[in-house]
Amino acid sequence: MKNKEVGVYVHIPFCKQKCYYCDFVSYCQKDSIIERYINAVKKEIRLQNIQAPITTIYIGGGTPSYIESDYIREIIGEIKKKNVIEKPEITIEVNPGTVTIDKLRIYRSCGINRLSIGLQTTNDELLKQIGRIHNYEQFLETYKMARKVGFKNINIDLMLGLPNQRIKDLKDSLEEVIKLNPKHISVYSLIVEEGTPIANKIQKGELVLPDEETERNMYWYVKNTLELNGYKHYEISNFAKEGYESKHNQNCWKQKQYFGFGAAAHSYRDITRYSNTPNIEEYIKNIEAERLDKNRTIHEIQKEYDMEKEYMLLGLRQIEGININDFKAKFVKNPIYVFRNELKKLTDEELIVVEGSTIKLTNKGIDLANLVWEEFV
């Protein structure tokens, strides 16, 4: 790993209130433990030997903007003691209702140059139904403050397929967001996870999801509208102005290495994928005892064929698809031969197309992407 670039992910698992659809590792009403947790994260960073240059840092959650900005500054300061390139991409996730202009100024001063703001929808009634703590007006205030303090590279998160969401609601949201001219827009379909409050409400009939056809129509409306407005569709759920694609996420999709710090954080190093314990108390205790290994669960030690399959799966998340020559350069094999059976099946079903030196999803394949990815799991 000496000459390979790496990314860093830091997990801040604290929230003001958990959204009704959220299945991520996050905790409310744990404020008393925040300082110990931040100290543990800083210690974990110190204990980790990272030789390779760090090109991207991503601070996610939870709601990282919920905690004091000084904690964020301390974490970034600790990472910067490592081999960080001169101008890394540093992203932090921000939720409206949890930031002030002073917090944003501190983010800028410690090198954060990309914000990801969770809006989800401009419809206040829908925001309430999914358990968001903010309204659209608070989002606008956050966005304007961010621009005022000098943030140019801003992502806005939207969601489609929400309970009781109509195509008109989505059109209105998209129209308002496009007016703001952010550099990046992510649009995710709601995934109903078992055991979440939203799943329980749907089961009881209190909330109704749009049908599959409506949800797909929403997706294609988003894709077409954003492309007409100068956004490049570069990954299933992501759109960017030229040159503003998320470098951190792109590196993950290109199978590059990354170190995860904090409870529940995932890492990919050499041929190993592992994650830290999701239990905050256990995480802190093990870090304080300098037992990094006790926090870790190894999910996979990859053989070459595992890496090849994963390369295909991750590559087919990207709209430009897989460059056959890049695959050959990495694995000294031709993917057309290695995956001849899978590719024939997917081509026959018109889910992928092989064009010149590229393998990519068709429009039908974008709609049925899960079926495509299943072939490489």
Go through the PLM ranges and name each one.
Residues 3-5, 26-48, 55-333:
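C-terminal scaffold of the Radical SAM
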Residues 8-11:
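Short active-site neighborhood of thiol/selenol oxidoreductases, capturing the structured segment around
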Residues 13-26:
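Local cysteine-cluster metal-coordination motifs and their immediate loop/turn environment
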Residues 333-345:
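Short amphipathic alpha-helical interaction segments
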Residues 347-357:
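A short, conserved structural fragment
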Residues 364-377:
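Short, amphipathic alpha-helical interaction segments positioned at domain boundaries
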